[in-house]
Amino acid sequence: MGSENSALKSYTLREPPFTLPSGLAVYPAVLQDGKFASVFVYKRENEDKVNKAAKHLKTLRHPCLLRFLSCTVEADGIHLVTERVQPLEVALETLSSAEVCAGIYDILLALIFLHDRGHLTHNNVCLSSVFVSEDGHWKLGGMETVCKVSQATPEFLRSIQSIRDPASIPPEEMSPEFTTLPECHGHARDAFSFGTLVESLLTILNEQVSADVLSSFQQTLHSTLLNPIPKCRPALCTLLSHDFFRNDFLEVVNFLKSLTLKSEEEKTEFFKFLLDRVSCLSEELIASRLVPLLLNQLVFAEPVAVKSFLPYLLGPKKDHAQGETPCLLSPALFQSRVIPVLLQLFEVHEEHVRMVLLSHIEAYVEHFTQEQLKKVILPQVLLGLRDTSDSIVAITLHSLAVLVSLLGPEVVVGGERTKIFKRTAPSFTKNTDLSLEDSPMCVVCSHHSQISPILENPFSSIFPKCFFSGSTPINSKKHIQRDYYNTLLQTGDPFSQPIKFPINGLSDVKNTSEDSENFPSSSKKSEEWPDWSEPEEPENQTVNIQIWPREPCDDVKSQCTTLDVEESSWDDCEPSSLDTKVNPGGGITATKPVTSGEQKPIPALLSLTEESMPWKSSLPQKISLVQRGDDADQIEPPKVSSQERPLKVPSELGLGEEFTIQVKKKPVKDPEMDWFADMIPEIKPSAAFLILPELRTEMVPKKDDVSPVMQFSSKFAAAEITEGEAEGWEEEGELNWEDNNW
């Protein structure tokens, strides 16, 4: 054995050993790399036999022959290390009829290989020389009795008689006239021994094998292999075509072993009906014998197999609907047999293999352990993101989405996460308890050209339904829906910021640049917006808001030309003492009417977020909106004194038209640069601002007990002032416009 005597021990023996009838002990062992093996321990006096067996095992390589690993000399004897196997005598009780039939076929192939390719004879084919590997295949061992056909002399046979099975010795060797068999009949001795072994195994076969086939096979054995005349025993290859070896399991196994030799037509026909043939087999047989043959690169490359068979093997059995074909394996068998194979396939970097694995990942991924998912599956799946194949990248992204539910986004995606998408959705069912920002003044506080989204039925969620007359047409494009503003308030839109209300129609001069950017309060700013609204609509509109005492709902329904809306509550102010004006530029002016010869401004800054107090319900309000196509867009409610109701002024005009404000359209700005724009003086308004005559466009004749209503251009929406004590310019120190000193 040469250098093997000094070789370090590279395995560890496990207890207990199994002792063969010949006295040979077989130990299970574990190699240094973690693989399993079997160690045959021979006595030192049998060193020649061990060397002979090791020589044959090294030179003879066949799937049905025991695979040799190493041979060393130890203190307790000579150790022959092979692949992990167990004696057939131990495993026979756990095997099914199909496995026994397939095992007999394996031993038959091994003997044919020895006879035809090696020109050797085994000389001891018996139960103790057959072993079962981990994958279920039967392996032929006991190679210490193997010799060439010409060397099987009577003397050699007598030398190995102590380790031979007496039942396997043919009758001709008992004759004193026995001589060496000729080369053409060298297989006769092994044929008889094989016939004896098969006959003993047929007794354990159950009803899975047809009685007719079994009876026919037994007759063939007696007439051929067990024939007492050696020359009448045919070669073992003649048994390969017998019906005993024509079962579904064996045919599937044989076809898969020779898959590379089959034509495309044969493979298509085979995989097309493979599911029907495999379904009749036991789950244990499929898991132990067929799974390694079906889950490999060759089968994954067959389109028919991928479409018609693999979906039923790549997932465990589950509750299925009526008429659906269930999967082949139970969850327990799938976990123990299929998952280890899939782990190995994930390390195969072939495109067609990865496509098949990821296409069915949802069916089996939950059967991996957390450690397997993190250390094997996830790293291998992530490799697909860097592949040049678009299909690999697409299926990889889909698989990562599946892994998120098992490993969590922190493991799959990595890094810190932040809330980017907020849960905001428009709500179309809200109560009518309106705060200041829900009031009609705030809802209709901006010109429709400033807001691009124009929604239909804007007041349906603001006012009670009883105020809508069935015969009153409403042009929904002229209004702005309250839900739009609610959405802006929720999402942090500039409209949700506190609005600074101007005094006397003039914006606060102390507004910062940030405020001017966030809220378009000037008409100039609004003109710079793109015209996303309806361009074909008339530019001039007049909207009058009048405050009336409460009337029954039936009276309101009788008005067909106006839209009267009754508000249940107003916040933060009293209806009898507050006038609210909305200018076209988006600013809101709030003033108190003159009651005792002095007028005081209302604070210009009202917060939309502070808690509001309910208004007094002594004077409920109605809001009437009248549209005119020839007037500019303006909304201005008339003033109502706290002591008296507004009196109706008899005139030739229509009802309420005396309060209509005639507004001139703002002139278009000169495109040329104004070199003196920075020289315009900045004049802060006093407590009461005197309206200059040039700013007035129309004055309604003063009537008794009626406050005059003045109309101004769209540039200034100044409050009505009747006092003349407040002066914009000093009377005594009038400015000299010709003076060059200032």
UniProtKB/Swiss-Prot annotation:
GO molecular function: ATP binding; identical protein binding
A GO cellular component annotation in the UniProt record: Golgi apparatus
Keywords, sorted A to Z: Cell projection, Cytoplasm, Golgi apparatus, Lipoprotein, Myristate, Phosphoprotein, Repeat
Record domain Protein kinase: where: 2-245
Record PTM Phosphoserine, positions in chain: S439, S707
Region of interest (Disordered), ranges: 506-544, 568-598, 629-652, 723-742
Entry comment describing in which tissues the protein is expressed: Ubiquitously expressed.
Region of interest (Interaction with EZR), ranges: 548-742
Each HEAT repeat, start to end: 199-238, 285-323, 333-370, 372-409
Entry-linked InterPro entries: ARM-like, ARM-type_fold, CIK-Related_Protein, HEAT_type_2, Kinase-like_dom_sf, Prot_kinase_dom, Ser-Thr/Tyr_kinase_cat_dom
An individual GO BP term: neuron development
Lipid attachment locations (N-myristoyl glycine): G2
Subcellular compartments: Cytoplasm; Golgi apparatus; Cell projection, Lamellipodium
Ribonucleoprotein keyword on record: no
Biased composition, class Acidic residues, residue ranges: 529-539
Record note on modification: May be myristoylated; myristoylation may target it to Golgi compartment.
Task of the protein: May play a role in regulating cell adhesion/migration complexes in migrating cells.
Family membership: Belongs to the protein kinase superfamily.
Subunit relationships: Interacts with EZR/VIL2 C-terminal domain.
Domain notes: The protein kinase domain is predicted to be catalytically inactive.
Name of the protein described by the UniProt record: Protein-associating with the carboxyl-terminal domain of ezrin
Native species: Homo sapiens
Lineage: Eukaryota, Metazoa, Chordata, Craniata, Vertebrata
Gene giving rise to this polypeptide: SCYL3
